Every structure is written in C-alpha cells, then in structure tokens.
Design a protein with these regions (language model features):
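Short beta-strand-to-loop acidic/aromatic patch adjacent to the donor-nucleotide binding site
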Residues: 209-219
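N-terminal signal-anchor transmembrane helix specifying type II single-pass membrane topology
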Residues: 2-95
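C-terminal catalytic/acceptor-binding lobe
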Residues: 2-10, 47-64, 87, 289, ...
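Active-site-proximal specificity loops/subdomain of glycosyltransferases
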Residues: 154-211, 225
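A recurrent flexible, glycine/aromatic-enriched loop bordering the glycosyltransferase active site
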Residues: 212, 253-267
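Conserved nucleotide-sugar donor-binding
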Residues: 223, 261-280
C-alpha cells in the first residue's frame, strides 16, 4: 500500500492512534518505513494523538476516584465538615449562627420577648391646678397605690401638701415656666401650654425602667391593673400614642378625630416620649392658635408621624347627666379610665362621687378588676324579663323581651357636651329612653361585694333603687314587687382579656325558698354554643 493510500484509509488511521504510537511495524513480513505522522507534513495528527491520550488518562482517573468514593462507608455526622455545613444551614434558615468564633460577630438574633408590662413600668403625669386641688385630690386617692406606682402631680402653684407630704398622694411638683411660648386663642387659657409639657417634663426626670408615660387630669380615675393589661398588648419599644376620642361628635370635629383626649387619659411609649421631649418646645411655637393641651400634643405627634392608636377603655365622658346608660352598656373592652366626674351625676344616687368610687374600688375592682362594668345579657323566661348585668356596678331589669342588639346599645340617660338631646351629636350608637312606662328599667345598684373562699367565687349584691314610677297596664310581673335584691356569683377571671373579646354570659339560678324577694344569677365565660336568648324553663 502506498503512503498516500494509507493516509486515506480509516483503518490505518485508527491503528496508528491506538497501536503504533509512532513506532515501526511489520507489513507483509517486511519492515516498513517510519510512520506517516512522524513526518514533518503530519505534525497536527501527532498533537491530536497526545491530547487524546491525556484525556483518556483523566477519564480513567475520574472513574477510579468515583468508584473509591462510592464504595467507602459514609462519614459520621459528628465530622467537622458536617458541623460546618450545619452551621451554615442554620444561619441561612434562622438568620442566626449555631456556633461562631469570638473574633467573628454572630448574625443578629431576634430580640427576646420582654416581660409583661406591670405597674412598676408606668409613670403617671397628672395635671392639676391649685384652685381645684382640695376637691380633686380625693379622686386621686381612690385609685393611687403609693407603694406600687410611680407618678407626679404637676401643679401651677404651691399647695399645702408640698410642705406636709401626704403619703396617699403622688409626689407634687410645680410645672416649668411657659411664658416664652406664644398663645393666641381668644377663648382658651395659657395653662394649656403648661399641661401639654407634662409628659416631657416627667421624661426629663430620668426615672429608670420606664416603659410608658401616662397622662391624665386630677379628675381622671384610672383602673391601674386594667391599664397595665392594655399596655401589655403593645410593644413599648415602638412609638405608640394610645388613647380615645370624645363621646361628642362635635368635639371631635372641632378638635380632631385623630387626637387622644387628655381627660380620658392617654399613654405614650418611652421611645416616643423621648422624641417628644426633644422637639416639643419647637413644636409648641408653631401652634399658638390651638385651644388646649391635648390638641397641641397631637399636633406634635403629627409632626413625628405617629398616629393615635384608639382604645375604647379610655373615657373622656364629654357628657352631662347620668352615666347609667353608658356604664351599663360598656364596650367589650377593659375599663381603663373615667373622667369629668365633677360634671356628671354621682355613680350611685344619694352619695358623693368620691364615696361611690370608693365603693367600686374597695369591692369589685379589688376582687376582679378585669371584669368591672362588663355587660352580660340574659332572660328570666318564666316572667319574660330582660336582664343586663354590669358587673360591679348595676343590674337592670326590663319587662318584656329586648334583643341583645338593643341592650348592648347605650340608653341616652345623658346629654351631649353642648347640652342638647340630639342623638346625632354622639360619636357612637345610642337608643332613646323607653317611652312606654312599662318598659322603664328597674335598676339595682351595687350594695356589697365579697369573696367566698370556700367556692373561690365573688359574691356581689345589688339593691333596688326605689322611686316613683308611672302606672303600667301590662299583665306582666312587676320586678319591684318580686325582687328586692339580686345576688351575682362570678369567679375571678384575670385572664379575661388574654382571650378574644367576648361578652360574659349570665344565667338565672333557681330561687332559694328561704330567701324571698331575691334573685340569684351566675356570670362567667360562655359555655360552648351558649348565646343570649329567651330559653325554656
């Protein structure tokens, strides 16, 4: 075969690559000449041969290594490589490191949950005036707990208690001078400037371990435990401004629907109080035409970009008259504060307001503050009576069957702030006082409260208020003729507001034969499928 033919033959080419390797071989019994690709003209074929051999070597090495790896036992999970892999995986999944060297900062871990807010974490700032101090201080003594709470009463002038300290009161202080701030409202009073700075002045005292600053007036009555319960539901490390509106629609229009009314009280978290203290003096100069203190605070909150967080337990009570309709249909929320107690009628007829408050605080508030004034609705089926229990305050009985939808709506036993009987002037739903003399409610006010250690139950008694009533022609049992007192049994439930909001249920108990003219009832958490309806007896 000729060299040119060999170059064109595929079999010759393959043999050369896999066998000859560029050496001489025998052909037809004779020694052939030097192989064709060793010549100068076939240099590319020589390079291809070397490269192909190198790839073949790598391929064999790869198969050998893979076979050795698969045939060997798996490494233990305690190996260093596995630990490092686990650390990386945990860091990606949880954004935290399981293990880190001292020289390497760990990834940021979630902040631990703080403990529940307690009274020790709250500082009160109470606005007061020397002119009304002698009367208003009695309200503060009702709810203040000297050894459990921290706070200050900020006055405009010196009062005698500053010299001879009263241990039943908070520390008394004189507010700072505000004459440098402009005030141009024609009908207002410059004291609004002083009062608006109470939170900032209290913050600057530098008290330790403060989570919340709570503002109120000297005629504001707080329920401290309920206040702590409410504030515990918020993260005190965030900027919060918590309070409620006026009951008067016109008041909210004149001032703001975004403002917490100071008389009802409001709470400012510590970080927000710090921000307010830094900017408030500059802020006050920009609003000389505002009327009061609370609208000035809201103006500064607007500049800080913090909205009002509303809570229905703070009560401004911009109303006149009797609070019965409001208190017997309280929202399903803890009662936090009461205000304008000098303006409205005493909570219990025939008593001073301070005495009425002391009765509630000495009994129901002490026994079960979470349930105070909470409404329960049930029916006396045999007599067709509708019953509403405002626990710790009053029980109302109405002849006839009223739906829960009606009974949870406040009766207008009060007038709005502008002394008009206009139901459109309220910022909530109300219902009129019954015109039918037969449907005028019978009111049983709190008479006593105690705790039964044997049954671990609170026992509250409510006595009928005797009054002249119009003639009723209904052939239906008269509650005043059959029931003088109503006894309500209720187990304390401090965790009431840790659950989803729901009215408690009440149940009429069988009457004891030896106790005539008494009706016994039970109030507590609703049972499964229990609703307020006229049942069978």
């Amino acid at each position: 075969m000729k060299d040119s033919d060999a170059a064109k033959s595929p079999s010759s080419l393959l043999w050369g690559v896999f066998g000859a390797g560029g050496h001489h071989h025998r052909h037809n019994g004779k020694a052939s000449s030097t192989h064709f690709w060793s010549t100068r003209d076939c240099k590319p074929y020589f390079l291809f041969h070397r490269f192909f051999v190198f790839l073949l070597f790598l391929l064999l090495l790869y198969f050998f290594y893979t076979y050795s790896l698969l045939s060997s036992p798996l490494p233990s999970c305690d190996g260093v490589a596995v630990v490092r892999l686990s650390n990386f995986t945990a860091a990606v999944a949880n954004r935290t490191e399981v293990r880190s060297s001292p020289s390497t900062p760990a990834l940021a871990a979630p902040r631990p949950q703080s403990t529940a807010t307690e009274l020790q974490h709250i500082v009160f700032g109470i606005a007061a005036s020397a002119k009304l101090w002698e009367k208003r201080k009695a309200y503060i003594k009702v709810w203040w707990r000297p050894r459990q709470m921290r706070g200050f009463v900020w006055l405009d002038k010196f009062v005698k208690e500053m010299k001879a300290k009263d241990p039943a009161l908070p520390v008394l202080k004189i507010s700072g001078d505000t004459s440098r701030f402009p005030y141009t409202h024609r009908k207002g009073d410059r004291s609004a400037l002083r009062i608006s700075r109470i939170v900032s002045e209290t913050f600057r005292l530098g008290l330790p371990n403060v989570r919340w600053f709570v503002m109120g007036d000297d005629d504001t009555v707080f329920l401290p435990d309920n206040l702590a319960r409410v504030l515990s539901r918020f993260d005190h490390r965030q900027p919060y401004y918590i309070g409620s509106l006026s009951e008067s629609h016109l008041q909210n229009i004149f001032f703001s629907y975004s403002m917490a009314y100071g008389g009802g009280g409001f709470a400012i978290s510590a970080p927000l109080a710090a921000s307010l203290a830094r900017v408030q003096d500059r802020c006050l100069r920009r609003y000389p035409a505002l009327y009061g203190s609370d609208d000035r605070i809201q103006a500064c909150m607007a500049e800080l970009g913090v909205p009002l967080t509303r809570h229905p337990g703070f009560h401004q009570y911009d109303v006149y008259g009797d609070l019965l309709g409001l208190l017997t249909a309280h929202p399903v929320a803890p009662l936090v504060s009461l205000h304008h107690l000098d303006v409205v009628q005493p909570l219990f007829p025939g008593e001073t307001q301070a005495a009425a408050l002391r009765r509630i605080f000495a009994g129901p508030v002490r026994l079960d503050s979470a349930g105070v004034i909470q409404q329960s609705i049930c029916y006396v089926t045999a007599r067709l009576w509708s019953v509403s229990v405002s626990w710790g305050f009053a029980v109302t009985v109405v002849r006839g069957v009223m739906s829960p939808r009606e009974m949870e709506m406040p009766t207008r036993t009060f007038l709005n702030w502008y002394r008009r009987a206009d139901y459109t002037a309220y910022a909530f739903n109300t219902r009129p006082v019954a015109r039918n003399p037969c449907q005028k409610p019978y009111v049983y006010y709190l008479a006593s409260a105690r705790y039964d250690n044997a049954t671990r139950t609170t026992v509250t008694e409510y006595a009928l208020r005797r009054e002249t009533r119009p003639t009723c022609r209904w052939r239906m049992a008269d509650p005043s003729a059959l029931v003088d007192r109503i006894v309500v049994y209720k187990k304390p439930d401090p965790g009431l507001w840790d659950r989803a909001p729901r009215r408690n249920c009440c149940r009429v108990l069988p009457a004891a034969k030896e106790r005539k003219k008494r009706m016994a009832m039970e109030v507590g958490t609703c049972r499964e499928s229990e609703i307020s309806e006229l049942g069978k007896q």
